[in-house]
Curated annotation (Swiss-Prot):
<keyword id="KW-0963">Cytoplasm</keyword>
<dbReference type="GO" id="GO:0005737">
    <property type="term" value="C:cytoplasm"/>
</dbReference>
<keyword id="KW-0560">Oxidoreductase</keyword>
<dbReference type="GO" id="GO:0006400">
    <property type="term" value="P:tRNA modification"/>
</dbReference>
<dbReference type="InterPro" id="IPR043133">
    <property type="entry name" value="GTP-CH-I_C/QueF"/>
</dbReference>
<feature type="active site" description="Thioimide intermediate">
    <location>
        <position position="51"/>
    </location>
</feature>
<dbReference type="GO" id="GO:0033739">
    <property type="term" value="F:preQ1 synthase activity"/>
</dbReference>
<dbReference type="Pfam" id="PF14489">
    <property type="entry name" value="QueF"/>
</dbReference>
<protein>
    <recommendedName>
        <fullName>NADPH-dependent 7-cyano-7-deazaguanine reductase</fullName>
        <ecNumber>1.7.1.13</ecNumber>
    </recommendedName>
</protein>
<comment type="similarity">
    <text>Belongs to the GTP cyclohydrolase I family. QueF type 1 subfamily.</text>
</comment>
<keyword id="KW-0521">NADP</keyword>
<dbReference type="InterPro" id="IPR050084">
    <property type="entry name" value="NADPH_dep_7-cyano-7-deazaG_red"/>
</dbReference>
<comment type="function">
    <text>Catalyzes the NADPH-dependent reduction of 7-cyano-7-deazaguanine (preQ0) to 7-aminomethyl-7-deazaguanine (preQ1).</text>
</comment>
<feature type="binding site">
    <location>
        <begin position="73"/>
        <end position="75"/>
    </location>
    <ligand>
        <name>substrate</name>
    </ligand>
</feature>
<feature type="active site" description="Proton donor">
    <location>
        <position position="58"/>
    </location>
</feature>
<keyword id="KW-0671">Queuosine biosynthesis</keyword>
<dbReference type="GO" id="GO:0008616">
    <property type="term" value="P:queuosine biosynthetic process"/>
</dbReference>
Length: 151
């Protein structure tokens, strides 16, 4: 347990909210079951960012699903990371891809997918989806299959 506490600096401490995009707040911990394929899903219904052109707020539900390998993302750090987009200007599609790439850098998962379900603006809903499967593995094939059969 001491080793786990050393890996995670945010749990049980006063929360400092970053005012702009802050990938450095993401933390990972060791997966105790890396030999198993299993899903971890985060549903984040209060995501906000800013339109990079108008500065108007955008609201979304972000869904993150992944198959962990050696590392897993710590949920409080993920919450703070997603909160850091609040004053960040990025298009919906960029937000989803940035989130996915940052989590890949952090954890190197076997597979990951991120969906943004953005609240309509101007009468149009945008639901960007991005995924990744580790190259040269069955997860790469899985990513291709899921992308080609997405909705």
């Amino acid at each position: 347990m001491t080793e786990l506490k050393e890996q995670l600096s945010l749990l049980g401490r006063k929360t400092e909210y970053k005012q702009d995009y802050a990938p450095e707040v993401l933390e990972a911990f060791d997966n105790k079951h890396p030999e198993n394929d299993y899903w971890v899903r985060f549903n984040c219904p209060e995501f906000t960012s800013l339109c990079p052109i108008t500065g108007q707020p955008d609201f979304a539900e972000i869904r993150i699903s992944y198959l962990p390998d050696v590392k897993m993302v710590e949920s409080k750090s993920l919450k703070l990371y997603l909160f850091s987009f609040r004053n960040h200007g990025a298009f919906h599609e960029d937000c989803v891809n940035i989130i996915m790439k940052d989590l890949i850098r952090l954890m190197d998962p076997k597979y990951i997918e991120v969906t943004g379900i953005f609240t309509p603006r101007g009468g149009i809903s945008i639901y960007p989806y991005a995924n990744y499967g580790r190259p040269g593995t069955k997860y790469e094939e899985m990513a291709t299959h899921r992308l080609m059969n997405h909705e």
